[in-house]
Amino acid sequence: MLHSYSEYVDEGMSMKKDSKTAEAFANSWNNLPLGSVYSDKQVQDWLLPLKEKDFKNKRILELGCGNGSFLLHIINWEPLYLEGVDLGDSVISAKKNLEITQKNWDIIQADLTEYKGTNFDIVYCIGVLHHLKDPKKGFDAVIKNVKKNGIFHCWVYGKEGNALIIYFVDPLRKICCMLPWWYTKYCIATPLAILFLIYANLVAKFSFIKLTKLFPLYEYCLWISQREFSFFVHVSFDQLVTPQTNYIPKSTIQSWLRSCEYLEDWYIIQRNGNSWKFGGALRNDTIYRLQLLIR
């Protein structure tokens, strides 16, 4: 069985244009307890329309794996081989998390925008492209790692539905990303998480009133109100710790997909009213072709 932690030899690793973002998220991931911050239900939701059965006996690649929170769930879906790539030192936590299993996996420290593996049936990238200096380059990396007849799936923050975040939270992020991670997490993100917890739960409680549907982040509030407080803190900290965040409109995603020469089928699905899931199949086989949901 393969269990390892590898590093692409690259003398310029610390000079990569996304290295500051990778370092910020490594500070976030490496200061969490071992284990996944997500439930299996959350992981399944992020990956839909892909399902657990799609991963069985397949070679899987995650670009931007963080501490391995997604990998910890997918390893139980019986993939043939599972690989995670991340630029930051969060790969240390990912390796520790994956060491509990005796299955085939590898964790690689590398710039995902330049990484090229081999023969992956499914490549996914969750919550990473929007933090890159060049999100399109990240998308291109996803595509180039999918083998012929393979599948890819991504999730990004949307420009649509995020006005509150873009105009009020993002300016705060530009300040917080320069502060020590512990100060941002405990002195800023945690108090904001308390306020958002109250807001989200009030929106959910009174969702039977039609007027609440006009409130900012309505659909997102219905989703996150079901989560524990620690997840609110995790989300708030993630929003504030990074030096780079892009909010990507649907039209941009459409242009990415249409520029993909070998793409047979593709889909774009709005998630919780403020983000986009999208992906497709680089193949011709109608038996395994993805169902087109939204185009």
Regions found by a protein language model. Name each.
Residues 122-133:
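A short SAM/SAH-binding and catalytic strip from SAM-dependent methyltransferases
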Residues 114, 130, 159:
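Active-site micro-motifs of SAM-dependent methyltransferase domains
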Residues 254-268:
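A SAM-dependent methyltransferase catalytic signature shared across enzymes that methylate proteins
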